[in-house]
From Swiss-Prot:
It catalyses: (S,S)-drim-8-en-11-yl diphosphate + H2O = (S,S)-drim-8-en-11-yl phosphate + phosphate + H(+). NCBIfam families: HAD-SF-IA-v3. GO terms for molecular function: phosphatase activity. Its EC number is 3.1.3.-. It comes from the Eukaryota. This is Sesquiterpene phosphatase astI. It is an enzyme of class 3 (hydrolase). Pathway: Secondary metabolite biosynthesis; terpenoid biosynthesis. Induction: Expression is regulated by the secondary metabolite regulator cclA.
Length: 201
């Protein structure tokens, strides 16, 4: 039997919420500078364009290489490393499945993620990704968080009033935009903290 909730849908971020990067599990050949290069790359305007679907993977690697003065092959190696270190958050996934079953809520993913990476996740993590009723990736939408257009596009697709939707993200700036649009925003601080939020509303 399902219990009626005040909210009808949950929007979850993927990175650092549903999935985490566990660099302790990287192969022994992984150098610290690869991890540093990855972090620097992901903060770059070039990578943000890649996340919006404005660049191909090859173009992204080439332009990042030019801007960071490294060989594009090193950029590719850094991103391959990120894929290898990706781990799901089983406690969160179990809780979300429980919510879907007991409260009948819809669950969506909304993530700043390039087309190639979301397709990789759908293929390599199919069992985890099936928890979502729909996945909204910046690479296909053409905008990224915290850009308001991304939120409006997602809410238009969901078709619910903002106050009936919970938005969960690990970045406060993204949560602030959601709150400004009327959603119930939660900055992710762990599964138990999220459980307290969602079971209390």
């Amino acid at each position: 039997m399902t219990r009626q909730s005040h909210y009808q849908a949950i929007i979850l971020d993927l990175g650092n919420v549903v999935f985490e990067w566990d660099t302790s599990q990287n192969p022994p050949t992984a150098a610290p500078n690869q991890i540093s290069l990855l972090r620097t790359s992901m903060k770059s305007p070039v990578y943000h364009s890649y996340e919006r679907g404005q660049l191909s993977t090859e173009e992204c690697h080439r332009l990042l290489g030019e801007s960071l003065h490294v060989d594009p092959g090193q950029i590719k190696e850094a991103f391959d490393l990120a894929r290898q270190s990706l781990r799901s958050n089983p406690a969160l996934l179990d809780f979300i499945r429980q919510l879907k079953q007991t409260r009948g809520v819809a669950v969506y993913a909304m993530s700043n993620i390039p087309q190639a990476e979301i397709e990789y996740l759908k293929e390599s993590r199919a069992g985890d990704m099936e928890v979502f009723d729909e996945v909204f990736a910046s690479g296909y939408v053409g905008s990224r968080k915290p850009e308001t257009e991304f939120y409006r596009r997602v809410m238009g697709e969901i078709g619910l009033k903002a106050e009936r939707v919970v938005f969960v993200d690990d970045k406060e700036e993204n949560v602030d935009v959601a709150r400004g649009l009327g959603l119930y925003g939660v900055c992710f601080g762990g599964v138990e903290e999220l459980r307290g939020h969602l079971l209390g509303i």
